[in-house]
């Protein structure tokens, strides 16, 4: 039967759009028929969906070459999933863009590299992944044609910078030191099962783990929302700054803040008066220093590269005055998360890179902007966060318990408080779960609370003080919102070498 000819990218795209609504079951059956007619072997694993579309739908043999899938049309086909969760539309995984050939890649010129040759013109077919639904029932829902040279100029520069950074590692004989965390949009993702396999690429240099070019999951999420849903306008973290090939984005972030190190918060508030008093005050000052119109975490670069901003105020011993919080979690959604690396906690706490801006007091007792750093959780601590995630899921599954205790409010009046059985700070010394809301709420659903699918067990005191005997007792139907936190003592150890004396 042989390959069907596609001379133009328009032909390929038209055929791709005709696949919308056809189930994977149909595609796999067509693929199997094509393979039988052409004496081809069926491929198993993550790539089999792409192979099934190429062979079954496009009648075109899958290739592993360093050139586009459709040579004459000069276009590379990708089939990738998105999902919908409490945070909206998200890419389910990174987009693999082919094996990194340490030995044979043209590391001297980006536009002549194997990466560029194969991926400069992409046709991306998106399907929705739904947990619990058989894969055979999925179908392509959206098709996007992406030319790298037509992406926003800032995206182009960052992608090229990432590629050139990979090239520098390889040419210096340091391919074995490559890490996804050091790249913004285009990363050298681990390829294969994640074992100890290593490849030799030069007799002089250490062997390196096999890797593939990949667009990060955070980049694909933002790309999907911008191009497929057109839900949001683009704003930049550094709108007035020209990104330079020889400078890291991380370095530019820190250099922009440097002139303000040692300045008092009061003087910064006078210079940057558009701030909200209270919790967001320091974040707003930092945003204005960067001349960003939006909150930094809503900007293009921060979302595509999965950066987070956190301002940390430390005491005289260098300990942050508060733990480091993340978004309140959905109890039912957390329980449905079976895969750790696809969880919201992993995305927010492990897969994120943090711009930490430190505030302290100077010798006069004035609060100042002390320093800033780029940080991500050390690999040795990742499993400790995973343990907290697993324990939180276990608590929800086995039953939340609310233990009644006695305390005093600010006026000194005796009150009831309720302690839950989620993992506390002594569980891992790295992360924990506790209330997210400013005020506790156990009697109704409002901005501070959630309604539980399975009511909590309320354990009351054996003896109730006389003045509290008429106080209502929760039914367990409602509970104060909860979130994951990095412990402040843990964060003290992470930032201790960056705190300056003023």
What are these regions (language model features)?
Residues 1-71, 76-502:
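Nucleic-acid endonuclease domains
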């Amino acid at each position: 039967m042989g390959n069907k000819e596609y001379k133009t990218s328009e032909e390929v795209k038209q055929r791709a759009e005709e696949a919308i609504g056809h189930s994977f079951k149909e595609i796999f059956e067509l693929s199997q028929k094509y393979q039988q007619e052409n004496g081809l072997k069926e491929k198993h694993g993550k790539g089999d969906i792409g192979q099934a579309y190429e062979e079954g739908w496009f009648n075109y043999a899958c290739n592993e070459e360093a050139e586009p899938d459709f040579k004459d049309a000069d276009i590379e086909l990708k089939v990738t999933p998105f999902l919908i969760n409490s945070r909206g539309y998200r890419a389910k995984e990174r987009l693999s863009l082919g094996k990194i050939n340490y030995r044979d890649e043209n590391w001297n010129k980006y536009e002549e590299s194997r990466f560029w040759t194969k991926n400069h013109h992409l046709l991306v077919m998106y399907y929705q992944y739904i947990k619990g639904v058989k894969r055979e029932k999925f179908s392509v829902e959206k098709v996007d044609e992406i030319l790298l040279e037509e992406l926003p100029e800032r995206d182009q520069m960052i992608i090229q910078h990432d590629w050139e950074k990979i090239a520098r590692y390889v040419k210096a004989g340091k391919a074995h030191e490559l890490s996804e965390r050091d790249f913004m949009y285009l990363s050298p993702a681990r390829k294969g099962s994640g074992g100890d396999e290593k490849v030799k690429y030069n007799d002089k240099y250490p062997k390196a783990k096999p890797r593939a070019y990949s667009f990060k999951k955070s980049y694909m999420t933002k790309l999907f929302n911008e191009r497929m849903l057109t839900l949001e306008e683009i704003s930049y973290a550094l709108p007035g700054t020209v990104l330079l090939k020889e400078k890291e984005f991380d370095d530019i972030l820190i250099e922009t803040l440097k002139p303000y190190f040692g300045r008092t918060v009061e003087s910064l508030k006078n210079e940057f008066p558009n701030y909200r008093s209270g919790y967001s005050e320091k974040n707003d000052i930092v945003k204005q220093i960067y001349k960003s119109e939006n909150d930094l975490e809503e900007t293009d670069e921060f979302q595509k590269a999965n950066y987070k901003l956190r301002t940390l105020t430390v005491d005289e011993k260098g300990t942050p005055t508060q733990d480091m919080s993340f978004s309140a979690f959905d109890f039912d959604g957390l329980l449905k998360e079976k895969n750790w690396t696809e969880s919201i906690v992993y995305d927010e706490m492990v897969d994120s890179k943090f711009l930490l801006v430190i505030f302290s007091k100077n010798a006069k007792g004035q609060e100042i902007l002390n320093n800033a750093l780029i940080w991500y959780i050390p690999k040795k601590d990742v499993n400790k966060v995973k343990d907290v995630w697993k324990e939180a899921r276990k608590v929800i599954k086995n039953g939340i318990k609310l233990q009644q205790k006695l305390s005093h409010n600010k006026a000194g009046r005796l009150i009831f408080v309720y302690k839950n059985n989620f993992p506390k700070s002594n569980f891992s010394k790295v992360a924990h779960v506790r209330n997210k809301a400013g005020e506790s709420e156990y009697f109704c659903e409002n901005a501070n609370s959630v309604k539980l699918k399975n009511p909590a067990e309320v354990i009351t005191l054996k003896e109730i003080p006389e003045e509290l005997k008429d106080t209502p007792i929760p039914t367990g139907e409602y509970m104060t919102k909860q979130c994951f936190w990095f412990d402040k003592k843990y964060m003290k150890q992470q930032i201790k070498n960056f705190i300056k004396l003023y």
